[in-house]
Amino acid sequence: LTETYTDEYLDLLISCVGENTEIPETVGEKFYTKTSEMAIPRKLSSFLYVLNEKFSPEETKCNILGREEETNLLIQILSKATKRNAILVGEPGVGKTAIVEKLAWKITTGNCYEKFKDLKIVVLEVNSILAGTQYRGSAEERFNELIKFLEQNPNCILFIDEIHTILGAGACR
């Protein structure tokens, strides 16, 4: 089946059949981008990536200089029992993404609390999820797919890169 039909045809077929239908493993490989232990649906693979895969567990030195204080503060916030949704706000180029990369390095190399060892940091590039949407419903479908993915993978930390494009949307001056 996978050799005869294109991915677009299979995408259409699965969307017609329904979400809860079992998909044979050979067909499923076409629909998921397999990362270490996490399969990102192909629909989301152009918007999401796993930041932990950027680093190797054997790395002894982090190539991200500084940001130690900010990274430790982020770890403290994420360790709290409640109200642990952190948002990094700052001017462009001050190192918001570097803080999250440093956190991913600490998780990958094991330089963090035990409860963080199995976490994956998934980066959502919000500009690309909004780009190319012809109507509002199209963007909503993409966000719904994202929410389903996150519900199926509770061991994820979602980092929304360029979140100001959503927060500032619709603002008037």
PLM feature segments, named:
Residues 133:
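Short beta-loop-alpha junction of Rossmann-like oxidoreductase domains
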Residues 136:
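Flexible, glycine- and charge-enriched loops at secondary-structure boundaries
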Residues 1-130, 139-172:
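Histone-fold recognition with a strong bias for associated Lys/Arg-rich disordered tails
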